[in-house]
Amino acid sequence: MGLSSLPGPSEGMLCVILVNTALSISIVKGIVRSFLGIVGISLSPSSSSPSSVTVSSENSSTSESFDFRVCQPESYLEEFRNRTPTLRFESLCRCKKQADNECSVCLSKFQGDSEINKLKCGHLFHKTCLEKWIDYWNITCPLCRTPLVVVPEDHQLSSNVW
């Protein structure tokens, strides 16, 4: 009857308690974030300025500090409309080979009289499809994830100066 190599009950309990505490905190954090997202408050990693609107991957800090950013989809949609003009498909693509072009959101082909938006990245989408995309709080291109509205460089620099 040798000595047992298994830990005693009191030794193993500390690890179990720590793991359960960490998991519980993570779950509560996820629930709070989901609730705030439903209410209309999005959490974004903050840069040094609380008034920053967007944070690029270069500027994001690794700390866990967050700022609350309330952004109405209507205001973002208006800004998108002001910066991205609506075009007719026939005026943009006068070539005969129009069968290749389709909207990646609704998967239907562009007609000659279709109102489309051409993004900075070069992708084409129906105006209504892209506006519906923005209504669902998506602020990037559906295909390549580049920002729909580009923040000017001088605005980004001024928002990162404390």
UniProtKB/Swiss-Prot annotation:
One of its GO terms (cellular component) is membrane. Pfam families: zf-RING_2. One of its GO terms (molecular function) is transferase activity. InterPro entries: XERICO-like (IPR044249), Znf_RING (IPR001841), Znf_RING/FYVE/PHD (IPR013083). It catalyses: S-ubiquitinyl-[E2 ubiquitin-conjugating enzyme]-L-cysteine + [acceptor protein]-L-lysine = [E2 ubiquitin-conjugating enzyme]-L-cysteine + N(6)-ubiquitinyl-[acceptor protein]-L-lysine. Induction: Up-regulated by salt and osmotic stress. Not regulated by abscisic acid treatment. Up-regulated by the DELLA proteins RGL2, RGA and GAI. The keyword Transmembrane helix applies. It comes from the Eukaryota. Its EC number is 2.3.2.27. The chain crosses the membrane at residues 12-28. Pathway: Protein modification; protein ubiquitination. It is a single-pass membrane protein. Ubiquitous. Higher expression in actively growing tissues. It is found in: Membrane. Disruption phenotype: Contains lower amounts of endogenous abscisic acid and is more resistant to abscisic acid treatment during seedling establishment. The keyword Repeat does not apply. A zinc finger (RING-type) spans 103-145. Keywords: Abscisic acid biosynthesis, Membrane, Metal-binding, Transferase, Transmembrane, Transmembrane helix, Ubl conjugation pathway, Zinc, Zinc-finger. One of its GO terms (biological process) is abscisic acid metabolic process. Function on abscisic acid homeostasis at post-translational level, probably through ubiquitin/proteasome-dependent substrate-specific degradation. Interacts with UBC8 and TULP9. This is Probable E3 ubiquitin-protein ligase XERICO. It comes from Arabidopsis thaliana. The lineage of its organism: Eukaryota, Viridiplantae, Streptophyta, Embryophyta, Tracheophyta. The gene is XERICO.
